[in-house]
Design a protein with these regions (language model features):
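A conserved amphipathic helix/loop scaffold
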Residues: 1-177
Length: 177
């Protein structure tokens, strides 16, 4: 199938069954911290509740990160040599796992929280899911100016730290000094 060609993993029809994914305890699944369910995510599982008429199952790959409740592989990882293939068979992949996969791929990680973060074209914005201290790690020393609530002063730094209220959005202009 086109999906198999794209991801380099053999998929198989899994028939009717649960879409909830139970994580296996693989190190890539570490760092999930939900005190209460968020969009169906808890620290050990994610995905939709209930049964669905058709599912695709991942292979018994090099690494099975998660399984459907009936034991069928649902989140798999395979080293393809120059790249890594990941198959996720259920919606709602937790941000912590996505962040760990990005880290594995060598991507810069701006924040280790599950807040929404947007970066591009000279702007970085963080929308806080929860209240508390926040930190944005920049890829290098950059000139930073807060756009909405700041005093307009610029500073050069490789880390932006601030306290945020739940659901507060902070927007920063960044540029090479």
């Amino acid at each position: 199938s086109a999906m198999e060609s794209l991801i380099g993993q053999d998929l198989a029809p899994a028939g009717r069954g649960p879409m909830r994914v139970e994580l296996t305890g693989d190190p890539l699944c570490e760092g999930l911290r939900y005190e209460e369910p968020v969009f169906g995510m808890v620290a050990t599982s994610y995905g939709l509740e209930g049964e669905y008429p058709e599912r695709l199952a991942g292979p018994e790959a090099e690494r099975v990160l998660g399984r459907f409740a009936d034991g069928v592989p649902a989140l798999t990882l395979r080293d393809m040599g120059s790249w890594v293939s990941v198959y996720n068979g259920s919606p709602g992949l937790p941000p912590g796992i996505l962040r760990n996969l990005a880290r594995l791929a060598g991507a810069h990680i701006y924040s280790d929280t599950d807040d929404a973060l947007y970066a591009g074209r000279g702007v970085i914005a963080l929308h806080a899911r929860t209240a508390g201290p926040k930190a944005i790690q920049l890829p290098r020393q950059l000139r930073v100016r807060e756009l909405l609530d700041g005093d307009g002063r610029e500073r050069t730094t490789d880390r932006i730290e601030f306290d945020a209220s739940a659901f507060e959005t902070r927007v920063f202009e960044v540029d090479v000094p």
